[in-house]
A protein has these predicted regions:
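Donor-nucleotide binding loops and adjacent catalytic segments primarily
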Residues: 1-64, 105
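Residues at secondary-structure transition points
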Residues: 11, 53-60, 71, 98-102, ...
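Short, well-ordered alpha-helical microsegments
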Residues: 13, 76-78, 127
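Mobile beta-alpha loop/short-helix "lid" or hinge segments that flank ligand
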Residues: 34, 120-131
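Short acidic-hydrophobic, aromatic-tinged amphipathic segments that line or gate anion-handling sites
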Residues: 49-52, 117-125
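A donor-sugar binding/catalytic signature common to diverse glycosyltransferases
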Residues: 58-99
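Catalytic binding pocket for nucleotide-activated donors in carbohydrate/polymer assembly enzymes
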Residues: 86-121
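C-terminal amphipathic helix plus adjacent low-complexity
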Residues: 132-159
Length: 159
């Protein structure tokens, strides 16, 4: 199953959903696709979609997914990486009114440069990213949360 995640941003991100729909129509995606559409009005007979679910339900979907296609939300990306998922990241862009600025572009570039994700930029094609993801081996993601907790504990212990 492919899981598409648009996050909770209150601006629509129809561009990503249309890309996925187009690849289904072309036969490049043959498996089940589930999409969390958030505030994006969208309907497609080939995509099972919902606007929002609670955290536990999203985690179950992430666990079931073979591939994640997502916006460049740091929380979404890191959660999927921690679960060892292959991820295609498509940043929301200001010029399409998908966000208020282009910070998702920088986030995407950072995760891509570190070898964690396949990035899909404005002019690139989803079909190429789908081909690339087949052989892509993402770098293992190590969260800094535990390290941060240990530093706080050490600090408190030494007060």
């Amino acid at each position: 199953m492919i899981l598409v995640l648009l996050g909770t941003q209150d601006k629509p991100f129809l561009r990503l959903l249309k890309m996925v729909s187009k690849e289904i129509d072309k036969g490049n995606i043959k498996e089940k696709v589930v999409a969390q559409t958030g505030y994006t009005a969208f309907s497609d007979k080939n995509i099972e979609s919902f606007d929002f679910k609670n955290k536990e339900e999203i985690e179950k979907l992430i666990d079931k997914a073979r591939l994640i296609i997502t916006h460049a939300g740091v929380g979404t990306i890191t959660e999927c990486l921690e679960k060892g998922k292959k991820i295609i990241v498509v940043p929301r862009l200001k010029k399409y009114l998908e966000h208020t600025n282009d910070h998702q572009m920088q986030i995407t570039k950072e995760f891509e440069m570190k070898g964690y994700v396949i990035a899909l930029y404005d002019k690139s094609r989803l079909s190429a990213a789908l081909d690339k993801i087949k052989t892509f081996k993402p770098k293992k993601y190590e969260s800094n949360s535990e390290n941060f907790r240990m530093k706080i504990k050490d600090y408190i212990d030494n007060i």
